[in-house]
């Protein structure tokens, strides 16, 4: 395999108001819980069943932090793209602990507000508010710069 990919895409609802922390250097970090729910019909009983999975999300990107800070509250519906990371630490008793989180920190992270109730002035025609990290720009190639002659 030539490379690898670590990308997580989730659509879900925020379980509680985002937690905003500030590092010693003054950088803001946001932690939030995102619920995704799967529904299906039981083949035997024909009952509707559902299972909710909770995802820990950590946001380091300054632009995304400011959007979440202003517009995201408990119940907000979000589309997020990030990467999966597992952290390891020792608790107070010295026992190793692990947690796996969806991390939004670099140019390939994305967050879209899917419910219009929280998007206020950031509503597009589709009722969504979207923010991509500033480095995620579409660079188009200008074909007019090419010579008409083929070099071989």
UniProtKB/Swiss-Prot annotation:
Supply the InterPro entries for this chain.
Answer: NA-bd_OB-fold, Primosome_PriB/ssb, ssDNA-bd
State the organism's lineage.
Answer: Bacteria, Pseudomonadati, Pseudomonadota, Alphaproteobacteria, Rickettsiales
Q: Which organism is it from?
A: Rickettsia felis (strain ATCC VR-1525 / URRWXCal2)
Keywords for this protein: DNA damage, DNA recombination, DNA repair, DNA replication, DNA-binding
NCBIfam families, per database record: PRK06642.1, ssb
SUPFAM superfamilies named among the record's database cross-references = Nucleic acid-binding proteins
Pfam families listed in its UniProt record: SSB (PF00436)
- Where in this chain does the record put each SSB domain? 5-111
Q: What is this protein called?
A: Single-stranded DNA-binding protein
Give the region (Disordered) as residue ranges: 115-152
Q: Where is this motif: Important for interaction with partner proteins?
A: 147-152
């Amino acid at each position: 395999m030539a490379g690898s990919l670590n990308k997580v895409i989730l659509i879900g609802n925020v379980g509680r108001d985002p937690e905003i922390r500030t590092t010693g250097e003054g950088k803001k970090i946001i932690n939030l819980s995102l619920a995704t729910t799967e529904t299906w019909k039981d083949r035997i009983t024909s009952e509707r069943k559902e299972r909710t999975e909770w995802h820990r999300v950590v946001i380091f990107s300054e632009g995304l932090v400011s959007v979440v800070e202003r517009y995201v509250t408990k119940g907000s519906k979000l589309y997020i793209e990030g990467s999966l990371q597992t952290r390891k630490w020792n608790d107070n008793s010295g026992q190793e602990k692990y947690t796996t989180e969806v991390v939004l920190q670099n140019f390939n992270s994305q967050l879209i507000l899917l419910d219009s109730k929280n998007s206020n002035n950031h509503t597009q025609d589709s009722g969504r508010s979207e923010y991509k990290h500033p480095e995620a720009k579409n660079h188009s190639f200008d074909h007019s710069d090419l010579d008409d002659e083929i070099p071989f």
